[in-house]
Structure formats: structure tokens, C-alpha cells
UniProtKB/Swiss-Prot annotation:
One BP annotation, GO: microtubule nucleation by spindle pole body
Protein name per the record: Tubulin gamma chain
Record note on quaternary structure: Interacts with SPC72, SPC97 and SPC98.
Residue sites binding GTP per the record: A143, G144, G145, T146, G147, S148, G149
């Protein structure tokens, strides 16, 4: 069984997404927005596991295991007003000095540095309420100031403080074209921390989110209220097997171990279809889908929540959750068909991992009782396109030296030389990641990795003296 998971919501994006996520989780577990159980009898035996995401007291009052953080109060205030008495007020952090990140990663990072003890103290106290703490999930954007900067500072601190706990992120990347020029700076700086400190990163981008929202919702005026429902749907589906456990995939570690073949290749692309009234409001009516149809449709680029060039991608690992009226024979038939369509490198297990998820028994009955929905997480080569887009925009702006003065803030950037060095080093880290993904497409990938490891061991051995001690250089 999985342990407890603490959700960290950083910045406006993270807290907006969190608002929809907790609404969804509460609905699936028959919990009201005030935290009270909606089951008719408190003695009713539950068919779910609330413990990974909720604390429960003796009066059947549920409280999310969540920490809300922002540099300004408006979004968190909106969340608290919507869910009165639901969140623990001790788990809310807003910058007390009125500082704003102002779309600058450096400002957000500096705010995190100056307030790190206070934030970590809240996290430590929340961990104290757990019995079998498994890890964190961070909700944030990499493009703004707080989500990227404060989020980066938090990733570094948690990786150092809790090195054996799983650190997952749900990270929203900007569209290729953006009104805020410095978003490319923020993205590269945050991406470095995702590469170095996250164990698994589920990637979204605004272009794909807006495109899918236009097809899913009846409302022609698409905004963040719609895209955030899509993100919360993915998080709900990823954690379905943890909250409605079976004998497989009942923990974060069991899910991500199927997807991540090596530590650096931990960026995952989500897909989902169809978005039904179980997850979103004001959805467009659609015909019923069989398990077979859903599994094949998940491979369609139009159902991916991250924009990537899908021409003949190489898949390293695939994990599906199929929820609803699932027919095992159709799952087997679909897997046979998909094995013929998906290109795996020879070093990969070439296995498609499928979780038969459980639809919450507390949700209203669907108009179509045979409805099936599916979520797919893919570790595949084309995610590198997201990083290439970020790098291309970054390179153009950085070459001109534009807006660098905005980042000469705090202890990390004490001089303009510090700014230049940090930007250059972060760009190199991202470049190395892209090269790793390209190399992983080759059948010789694992052989090359082993050779590199042996060479590194050889270099270390050469630095030892006759007694086996490290030489002083």
C-alpha cells in the first residue's frame, strides 16, 4: 500500500490547479467542500483509501495534506473562500513583506531563500501527521515568478532535506509564443532544477491545454478555469490506483518505476480521453467509448496535453489507467494492436503497463453506464521538443543580453557575472538532457551508459594514491 503524499502548491498556477484538484478528490471520496464526510452513515465501510491525501479526525472531518504558497494573497484567498474550513490554515504561506515575484524567477527564488525556514517548518509539521510518508507532488508553472523561482528553491531544499522521498512535479510550460519575454529565462532556470532535483515530472504546455479545452468544453471563451480542470483530471487519474488501491500500482514508487528507465529520463507526457462529467463541468456530449477504442485513442496526438512533434516517436515506457466499464479482453486486444504501432528501442522492456482503475462509487451515475475513460503517461523521445522550444526562445533573448538586470537579485545573483554564469550553466544542463533523450532512441543506449560509467570509475581510480586514498590536487 502507498504512503501519504503531501501536495505543494506554488504560485498562482499551482494554487489554481490545486483548487480544481481538491474539488475533484473530495468529490471522488464523498467529502464536502467543508471537509465533512457526505456518507449517510459514519460507520459505513469505505471502498476507498483517503489516507494518502487526507487527514481524518475523530469527527470524520477530512483535511487535505496540502501546503499552499504564494508571494501575494489573492489566489489563496479565493481558494480558502471557496472551501471554507477545508484547508488547514497553518498550511498556508504568503509572503509577509508584500514582496511580489513580478514574473522573475530570481525574485521568486530569493523569496524562497529568505523564507525557507518558515516554509520547511510547515512541511515538517505536516509530515509529522503521517504514518508512512512516501513523498511530495509539486503543482506549479515554470514560466512565472513564484511557481518557477520559489518552486525551484523548494525543489532544492526538499531534495537535500528528504533525499529518500519521492519528489514528483506537475509542471506547466508556456506556449511557444508568449507575451512575457522573460518567460524563457524563467523556464530554463526552473527546468534545470526539475532535471537535477525532481524524480518524475509530468509535463503540460499551455498551447496544448488551450487546444484541447476548445474541443472539450461547450464554452467558446476558454480560460484558465477550463485548462486547470484538464490538469486536475490527469493528477486524479495518475493517483487513482493509490486512492482506490488494488494489488498493483498502489504507490507512487510502483507507478514511476515502470516509467523511468534512468534518473535523467524522468519527463513524462500525459494524454487523456474522453473528458467526461466525472472530471469536468460543461463538457461536450460524446458517444460511448469501449476500452479498446480508448486505448488506441490515447495514442492520438490530439489527445496529448503536451505539444510535441509526434512523427514516429520512440517510446521508452508507457503506463495507462483505464477507468469505467472495462472489458479485459478488449484491453488485451488493444495491447496487441499497440505493440505493433509503438516503436520501442531494443534496450527497453517494450512493455505497456495497464492499470484497470476503479471509478469512484460515490460519483453520480453516468448517462452511459458503459462509459470508459483512459489516461496515458508516456516516457518518449518527443518531449525533447518542449525543451528545444524553450531553448530556442531563450537563446534569442539571452544573446541580446535583454532584461538580465531583472535577475540581479538576492544571494544567488550577487553580481551580473553570477547572472551570466547561472544562465549559461542552466542552458548547458538542459542541453545535456536533450542529448540524453536523443541518445536513448538508439538501441546501444544502455551499452553507452555502461561505458561512460566505467570510464568515470577509471578516472576516479587514477586519482587514488598507492594507499587507496584520494590524491590532493
Amino acid at each position: 500500500m502507498g504512503g501519504e503524499i503531501i501536495t505543494l502548491q506554488a504560485g498562482q498556477c499551482g494554487n489554481h490547479v490545486g483548487k480544481f484538484l481538491w474539488s475533484q478528490l473530495a468529490k471522488e471520496h464523498a467529502i464536502g467542500t467543508d471537509g465533512l464526510s457526505q456518507l449517510p452513515d459514519s460507520s459505513t465501510e469505505r471502498d476507498d483509501d483517503t489516507k494518502p491525501f487526507f487527514r481524518e479526525n475523530s469527527r470524520n472531518k477530512f483535511t487535505p495534506r496540502a501546503i499552499m504558497m504564494d508571494s501575494e494573497p489573492s489566489v489563496i484567498a479565493d481558494v480558502e473562500n471557496t472551501f471554507r474550513g477545508f484547508f488547514d490554515p497553518r498550511n498556508t504561506w504568503v509572503a509577509s513583506d508584500g514582496a511580489s515575484a513580478g514574473n522573475s524567477w530570481a525574485n521568486g527564488y530569493d523569496i524562497g531563500t529568505r523564507n525557507q525556514d518558515d516554509i520547511l517548518n510547515k512541511i515538517d509539521k505536516e509530515i509529522d501527521s503521517t504514518d508512512n510518508f512516501e513523498g511530495f507532488q509539486l503543482l506549479h508553472s515554470v514560466a512565472g515568478g513564484t511557481g518557477s523561482g520559489l518552486g525551484s528553491n523548494l525543489l532544492e531544499a526538499l531534495c537535500d532535506r528528504y533525499p529518500k522521498k519521492i519528489l514528483t512535479t506537475y509542471s506547466v510550460f508556456p506556449a511557444r509564443s508568449s507575451e512575457v519575454v522573460v518567460q524563457s529565462y524563467n523556464t530554463i532556470l526552473a527546468l534545470r532544477r526539475l532535471i537535477e532535483d525532481s524524480d518524475a515530472t509530468v509535463v503540460f504546455d499551455n498551447a496544448s491545454l488551450l487546444n484541447i479545452s476548445g474541443k472539450v468544453f461547450r464554452n467558446p471563451n476558454i480560460d484558465l478555469q477550463h485548462t486547470n480542470q484538464l490538469i486536475s483530471t490527469i493528477i486524479s487519474s495518475v493517483t487513482n490506483s493509490i486512492r482506490f488501491p488494488s494489488y498493483m500500482y498502489s504507490s507512487m514508487s510502483s507507478i514511476y518505476s515502470t516509467l523511468i528507465p534512468s534518473p535523467e529520463l524522468h519527463f513524462l507526457s500525459p494524454s487523456f480521453t474522453p473528458f467526461t462529467s466525472d472530471y469536468i463541468h460543461d463538457d461536450i456530449a460524446h458517444k460511448g467509448h469501449s476500452s479498446y477504442d480508448v486505448m488506441l485513442d490515447l495514442l492520438d496526438p490530439s489527445n496529448s496535453l503536451v505539444s510535441t512533434a509526434m512523427n514516429n516517436p520512440t517510446y521508452f515506457n508507457v503506463y495507462n489507467t483505464i477507468i469505467g466499464n472495462v472489458e479485459p479482453r478488449q484491453i488485451s486486444r488493444a495491447m496487441t494492436k499497440l505493440q505493433q504501432r509503438i516503436k520501442f528501442p531494443s534496450w527497453s522492456s517494450s512493455a505497456m503497463h495497464v492499470n484497470i482503475g476503479r471509478r469512484s462509487p460515490y460519483l453520480p451515475l453516468q448517462p452511459n453506464e458503459n462509459e470508459v475513460s483512459g489516461m496515458m503517461l508516456s516516457n518518449m523521445s518527443t518531449v525533447v521538443n518542449v525543451f528545444e522550444n524553450a531553448c530556442n526562445t531563450f537563446d534569442k533573448v539571452f544573446a541580446k543580453g535583454a532584461f538580465l538586470n531583472n535577475y540581479n537579485v538576492g544571494d544567488l545573483f550577487q553580481s551580473m557575472q553570477n547572472v551570466q554564469d547561472e544562465f549559461a550553466e542552466s542552458r548547458e544542463v538542459v542541453q545535456s538532457l536533450m542529448e540524453d533523450y536523443v541518445a536513448a532512441e538508439q538501441d546501444s543506449y544502455l551499452d553507452d551508459v555502461l561505458v561512460d560509467d566505467e570510464n568515470m570509475v577509471g578516472e576516479l581510480e587514477e586519482d587514488l594514491d598507492a594507499d587507496g586514498d584520494h590524491k590532493l590536487v
